[in-house]
Amino acid sequence: MAECCVPVCPRPMCIPPPYADLGKAARDIFNKGFGFGLVKLDVKTKSCSGVEFSTSGSSNTDTGKVSGTLETKYKWCEYGLTFTEKWNTDNTLGTEIAIEDQICQGLKLTFDTTFSPNTGKKSGKIKSAYKRECINLGCDVDFDFAGPAIHGSAVFGYEGWLAGYQMTFDSAKSKLTRSNFAVGYRTGDFQLHTNVNNGTEFGGSIYQKVCEDFDTSVNLAWTSGTNCTRFGIAAKYQLDPTASISAKVNNSSLIGVGYTQTLRPGVKLTLSALVDGKSFNAGGHKLGLALELEA
């Protein structure tokens, strides 16, 4: 009897994230949904011609300092081009031009410049990123009068395992000023990340999606030569499609809580508070308020 051969489909390969995004899922649980000591307003709009406008303003309740940014972005999809103009209240102007998937598939080139009229300071940076199955590479050149600095990174992935390296070479000093290494593992609902920065800082994080509405994260960090170990636990619970609550606590007894509510499509309100558990009656606690508008 002839055997029936059934074709086996190869396991789909995925593109690993850039080095800066390793462990991002765990960091987002700790960072998003909180804004201690700030009153913040974010507005995003898009014109009929496709130009995107983003405006952000914040006031620090401790110092009273007010800061803001304005960004316009236009995408020329036919040629893979993106033009971005930036301005902030420090009176710094920025221009960014990016081209993606045109020279070759997976390659992105970015030209980034900034100029401060008050001081006359100028800066320029050329960024390159290349991503394919199992690999994500990046190389940036930061131009400076003393000499350019070269930032490089590489992340390799295979069957959920991730390994990455990040470095910075200062040509003015002719030496490596940054050398970081990371190893991790991720699945659909679980991520593990460990890293060593410059051989002195050791860190790790775990992210787990316990169920559809409940995410948890654990973070641990230690610096060699000190007895200081930093440890934190955070969680986010989606109450319903329009509301979520976040909470976190660390080994310094700092307790943070946040509540996010979508008031209507395009309008989101976030309230947050930070409580010092060691001096609960002494004050020094912080509140935060953020409003996001998008149209």
Swiss-Prot record:
Crosslink feature (Glycyl lysine isopeptide (Lys-Gly) (interchain with G-Cter in ubiquitin)) location: 32, 65, 121-122, 173, 278
Residue list for modification N6-acetyllysine: 32, 121, 278
GO biological process, one term: negative regulation of protein polymerization
Modified residues (Phosphotyrosine): 79
Gene Ontology molecular function, alphabetical: ATP binding; ceramide binding; cholesterol binding; oxysterol binding; phosphatidylcholine binding; porin activity; voltage-gated monoatomic anion channel activity; voltage-gated monoatomic ion channel activity
Cellular localisation: Mitochondrion outer membrane; Membrane
Keywords of this entry: Acetylation, ATP-binding, Ion transport, Isopeptide bond, Lipid transport, Lipid-binding, Membrane, Mitochondrion, Mitochondrion outer membrane, NAD, Nucleotide-binding, Phosphoprotein, Porin, Transmembrane, Transmembrane beta strand, Transport, Ubl conjugation
Catalytic reaction annotation: chloride(in) = chloride(out); K(+)(in) = K(+)(out); a 1,2-diacyl-sn-glycero-3-phospho-L-serine(in) = a 1,2-diacyl-sn-glycero-3-phospho-L-serine(out); a 1,2-diacyl-sn-glycero-3-phosphocholine(in) = a 1,2-diacyl-sn-glycero-3-phosphocholine(out)
Cysteine pairs bridged by disulfides in the record: none
Modified residues (N6-succinyllysine): 32
Residues annotated for NAD(+) binding in this entry: 254-256, 272-276
CDD domains: Porin3_VDAC (cd07306)
Residues modified to Phosphothreonine: 119
Gene Ontology CC terms, in alphabetical order: mitochondrial inner membrane; mitochondrial outer membrane; mitochondrion; myelin sheath; pore complex; sperm midpiece
PTM comment, free text: Ubiquitinated by PRKN during mitophagy, leading to its degradation and enhancement of mitophagy. Deubiquitinated by USP30.
UniProt tissue specificity: Highest levels of expression detected in testis, less but still abundant expression in heart, kidney, brain, and skeletal muscle. Expressed in the sperm midpiece (at protein level).
Pfam family, one: Porin_3
Domain of life: Eukaryota
Family: Belongs to the eukaryotic mitochondrial porin family.
Summary of subunit composition and partner proteins: Monomer, homodimer and higher order oligomers; formation of higher order structures is necessary for scramblase activity. Interacts with ARMC12 in a TBC1D21-dependent manner. Interacts with KLC3. Interacts with SPATA33. Interacts with PPP3CC in a SPATA33-dependent manner.
Protein name: Non-selective voltage-gated ion channel VDAC2
Originating species: Mus musculus
